[in-house]
Amino acid sequence: MRGFMLRVAFAAVLSSNLPAGNWKLEAGSWKLTRYESVEPHMGTLVKITVYTSGEDDARRAFRAGFDRIAALDAILSDYKPDSELNRIAGIAVGTPVEVSRDLFTVLEAARELAEATAGAFDVTQGPVIRLWREARRSRHVPDEDALREAASRTGYQKLHVDRDRCTVRLDQAGMALDVGGIAKGYAASEALAAITSLGVRSSMVAISGDLAFSHAPPGTSGWRISVHDLAGEQAVPDVLQLADGAVSTAGAAEQHLDANGHRYSHIVDPSTRMGLTDDLTVTVIARNGLVADGLDTAMSVLGVERGLALIDARQDAVALLIRRTGSDVELLQSSRFQSFVQALRGPAH
């Protein structure tokens, strides 16, 4: 979740117009204070915001959230050689291997999204993604032969999940899984759940630009989240007030390679093995981060028309897209955007 609108949304959430201070609930005689904490996890900065009755409760909430994210990073990271994700690539070839519930949840969701998008979203693209990761360091587009060889070790059909047994099986040696297009959203929602389990009603977790948030802050109808900064009259407000949901944004503004007259995104199209070159930013709003994070990546690969068709066929998410062509900027929204956003507004308390 990772682009122009992503940075705008992240900044807006972290610098909410709600000042730190005491907030008295209508239904009680105790006060809530806003507390914030930042730690590095999953290769980025994670910020947690909570409203609690005191510092001790806030510290417990922060620790629960950050610890949950750290535990998930140890499972889902493709950068850590000893992560569970990387370990199964070597032992699950041809043999079903039982995995943790967290890893299974992410891989099952990824497999389902791959089916729904005919492979536009594909976590088996690890070998290809690693070539593009190296390309961003060397500032050179990957060699065609190297891309072709890497792609021969990919394909979502080669990834099998068994819900009853909680197992994963791979069809081919040399495969590498990369869940970067879905993991941060899952981690944000899981950290939020850990905080909520402590009795904290209003909290927000921001992992880079993957945002998950619970009940509205005191005295408001939602967390203020900026979704675009386009000038002029727009059908969509530039700031939304949302509660009990998640927001994820994908784009090429932060991670990209400028080469051969093109800007190649870190998001790779499995059908071409190339980084995306369209200037498209996708923001997805959903009830949970797992859904939002996966869909923004899938829609980026599918493009505007097919991406909107994908999300319009679902009931659990909506999307806002910004497409830039030269000096022209176009703002597009999925068909149920307004009604879905309205449903995520919480009553002021």
Residue ranges and their predicted role:
Residues 2-349:
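Mature catalytic core of soluble alpha/beta enzymes
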